[in-house]
């Protein structure tokens, strides 16, 4: 009786979650289908849900209209560099706040926490003035460096590092390990799951970054995918099937990366959430 009552109780919840899931995934499905439609299929009425024929030429036209491969390369390069630098800084900061003692530790920790509530739009003007004053506009350094500080990934790793027993660190010190050796052989080795989740989060954030690359790139060859799609919209005019094809190619790597790392991401977020 208890199990039967539980099933009946969960059914409305299941139906609501199913409905919400369908609503959330519908735009993605529509984008995928529209990417293969002809211009006539897009504008036909009543709505044609499936393409009359799969127009693979839509993807070819995108490459002809804008330097899409260049946008891809810029996005991959800047995202990888930003992620690597951000994770390296987050690991170092998390280790210090989780396991070391130093003056004003609590004050600095509160400052880092408060930085999570400062939106990027507030910092855009001073950051742009700094980048422009140092001549880094239209350079990879200008895109990468202002975005390498990751408060969220730092807080995530701090929460995870505090779960590592101090006995492991004490044993490493007895064996003659210094701070950097402990960081590598104890903290990082035992935090692969959390670091993987932080890498995934940082990479996704930098890949879809739009505002900052838009401000510091004036040359076509320096644009990233997010910025390049904006200019494709003006070039493609009313050819929505080309916009959908470009959008699909832009998010394909993100989908692949997330599918490969999804288990680590969920596991790490659950563990750090419980600890916090």
Task: List the predicted regions and their residue ranges.
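A structural signal for multi-pass alpha-helical bundles of membrane permease subunits
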Residues: 2-276
């Amino acid at each position: 009786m208890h199990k039967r009552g539980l099933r009946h109780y969960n059914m409305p919840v299941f139906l609501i979650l199913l409905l919400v899931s369908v609503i959330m995934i519908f735009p993605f499905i529509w984008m995928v289908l529209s990417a293969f439609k002809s211009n006539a299929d897009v504008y036909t009425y009543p709505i044609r849900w499936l393409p009359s024929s799969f127009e693979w030429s839509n993807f070819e036209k995108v490459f002809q209209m804008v330097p899409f491969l260049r946008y891809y390369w810029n996005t991959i390069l800047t995202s990888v560099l930003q992620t690597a630098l951000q994770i390296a800084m987050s690991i170092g900061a998390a280790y210090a706040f989780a396991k070391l003692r130093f003056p004003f530790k609590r004050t600095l920790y509160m400052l880092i926490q408060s930085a999570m509530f400062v939106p990027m739009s507030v910092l855009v003007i001073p950051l742009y003035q700094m980048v422009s004053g140092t001549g880094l506009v239209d350079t990879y350094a200008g895109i990468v460096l202002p975005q390498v500080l990751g408060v969220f990934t730092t807080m995530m790793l701090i929460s995870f590092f505090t779960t590592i027993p101090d006995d492991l660190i004490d044993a490493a010190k007895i064996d003659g390990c210094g701070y950097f050796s402990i960081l590598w052989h104890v903290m990082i080795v035992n935090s692969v799951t959390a670091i993987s989740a932080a890498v995934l989060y940082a990479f996704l954030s930098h890949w879809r970054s739009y505002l900052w690359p838009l401000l510091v790139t004036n040359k076509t060859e320096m644009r990233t995918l997010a910025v390049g799609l904006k200019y494709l919209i003006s070039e493609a005019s009313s050819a929505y099937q080309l916009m959908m094809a470009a959008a699909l190619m832009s998010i394909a790597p993100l989908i692949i990366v997330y599918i490969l790392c999804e288990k680590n991401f969920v596991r790490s977020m659950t563990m750090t959430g419980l600890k916090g």
